């Protein structure tokens, strides 16, 4: 632990800013003015040491996941555009420099370097929406050593979270078998920034919309919504609540029918649906949020169909995940769409993916780590994917950058940033389309929720030989 020179070995680092002053100075939001400080302290102390000793030659770091989380057979690339936008705009402003100076840790020369800091490096990456597998490099950063070091925390924070959510969302979308899946997670997400990123990652993987209005404005994602039980309870009775809402929103009303009794609720919804039709409106859907979803959905569908309302859809919500959705559909639930919240936004069964960022090459040659259980692959690399005649992926090859396997392989990592500028920002719709195509191409056995097969990822002969030489020379 780094501490002030006058502190004892057990004293924690303290800044010149008191907790009371800090509490009144900033509400704690992360934005362009302070995101450069969203880093671990040792990134800055290491970088200052590099600066003092003239160690700022070009270096390459790789971001990768060591192993699949429990219950996962594949991962989905997400968060790249967010990360690249942060790299483009990364600045240490006057307030940040003032705070760092107050820590009495950093050399004046290094603080001057930070004041003029701009990220000038290159990034190669597996595009957003693409499926990938450990230990393939998700991205590689090649930049002056200090630049590449300083962005580690920011990249891991951004990529780990969005890959985690996208990979969970993909499983939910696949389990829904073509039925709509809506992100309804903001109130359960781990913070305001997380809620935005969840909506984006979920939309990439095929979710049809989000309840998060800010995400709709920011990313152009369709926004969706129903009503809460509190709305129904705010009126004299359920029928009055439904009628009022239908009058206010005659073209997109979704009625929550389980506040008191689901079958009584659908009876009231049928009354309102006929009243809406008489005035040119149309009831879009009813929502069931509790109880025996399977039995209730069948009964509600029967009631709606019997009333001539076959076009009215049924939306289910209530602690859903891919396992529950698959079970409901297997048992014949009558449902058109799912609203998923907590399980999606927190990836409850696999709440982290353990992505790491490691030095793999610099001007002195290959760099590597041999620690037991944490060994790394040296050198800049490319991932090559092989497909069968039907276009299904059948195996990946991790190779050194200058290797060229046979023509049946397709490279995955592409240039996404050069000279600190994004090469070609992609519209979110294009990323979403790519992900839909990639998920559709996966073999069924890889999409299984349980007991999925292990996808083959191998090392090229040259990379294997290099790793063997390194181990032998240790």
Predicted stretch roles:
Residues 2-57, 70-72, 305-307, 312, ...:
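Gly/Ser/Thr/Ala-enriched C-terminal appendages of enzymes
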Residues 4-58, 67-69, 105, 111-120, ...:
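Buried, small/hydrophobic-residue-enriched core segments of structured protein domains
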Residues 59-115:
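N-terminal, Lys/Arg-enriched amphipathic/low-complexity engagement segments
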Residues 85-90, 125-128, 132:
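An N-terminal, globular interaction/scaffold subdomain
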Residues 99, 167-171, 185, 447-453:
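Short coil/turn segments at secondary-structure boundaries
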Residues 224, 286, 314, 336-338:
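Hydrophobic residues within beta-strands of alpha/beta enzymes
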Residues 229, 317, 341:
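Residue-level "edge-of-site" marker
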Residues 253-254, 312-314:
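Short active-site oxyanion
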């Amino acid at each position: 632990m780094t501490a002030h020179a006058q502190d004892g070995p057990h004293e924690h680092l303290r800044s010149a800013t008191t907790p009371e002053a800090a509490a009144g100075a900033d509400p704690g939001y992360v934005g362009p003015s302070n995101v450069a400080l969203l880093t671990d302290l040792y990134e800055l102390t290491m970088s200052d040491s590099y600066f003092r000793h003239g160690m700022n030659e070009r270096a390459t770091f790789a971001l990768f996941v060591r192993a699949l989380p429990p219950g996962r057979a594949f991962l989905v690339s997400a968060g790249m555009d967010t990360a690249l936008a942060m790299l483009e705009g990364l600045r240490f402003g006057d307030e940040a420099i003032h705070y760092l100076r107050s820590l009495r840790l950093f050399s004046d020369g290094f603080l001057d370097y930070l004041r003029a800091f701009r990220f000038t490096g290159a990034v190669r990456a597996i595009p957003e929406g693409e499926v990938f597998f450990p230990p393939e490099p998700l991205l590689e950063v090649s930049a002056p050593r200090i630049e590449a070091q300083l962005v580690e925390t920011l990249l891991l924070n951004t990529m780990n979270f969005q890959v985690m959510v996208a990979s969970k969302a993909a499983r939910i979308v696949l389990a829904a078998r073509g039925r709509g899946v809506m992100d309804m997670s903001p109130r359960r997400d781990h913070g305001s920034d997380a809620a935005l990123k969840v909506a984006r990652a979920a939309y990439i993987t095929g979710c049809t919309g989000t309840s998060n209005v800010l995400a709709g404005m920011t990313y152009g994602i369709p926004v969706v919504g129903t009503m809460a039980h509190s709305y129904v309870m705010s009126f004299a009775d359920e029928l009055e609540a439904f009628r009022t809402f239908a009058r206010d929103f005659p073209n997109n009303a979704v009625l929550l029918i389980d506040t008191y009794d689901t079958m009584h609720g659908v009876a009231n919804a049928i009354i309102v649906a006929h009243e809406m039709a008489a005035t040119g409106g149309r009831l879009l859907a009813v929502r069931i949020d509790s109880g025996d979803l399977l039995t209730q959905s069948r009964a509600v569908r029967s009631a709606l169909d019997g009333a001539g309302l076959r076009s009215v859809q049924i939306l289910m919500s209530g602690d859903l995940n891919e396992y529950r959705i698959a079970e409901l559909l297997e048992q014949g639930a009558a449902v058109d769409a799912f609203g998923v919240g907590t399980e999606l936004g927190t990836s409850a069964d696999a709440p982290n993916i353990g992505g790491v960022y490691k030095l793999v090459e610099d001007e002195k040659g290959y760099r590597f780590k041999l620690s037991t259980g944490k060994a790394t692959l040296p050198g800049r690399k490319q991932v090559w994917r092989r497909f069968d005649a039907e276009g299904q992926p059948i195996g990946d090859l991790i190779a050194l950058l200058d290797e060229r396997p046979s023509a049946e392989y397709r490279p995955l990592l592409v240039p996404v940033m050069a000279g600190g500028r994004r090469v070609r920002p992609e519209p979110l719709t294009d990323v979403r389309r790519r992900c839909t195509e990639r998920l559709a191409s996966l073999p069924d056995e890889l999409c299984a929720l349980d007991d999925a097969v292990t996808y083959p990822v191998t090392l090229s002969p040259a990379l294997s030989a290099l790793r063997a030489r390194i181990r032998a020379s240790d």
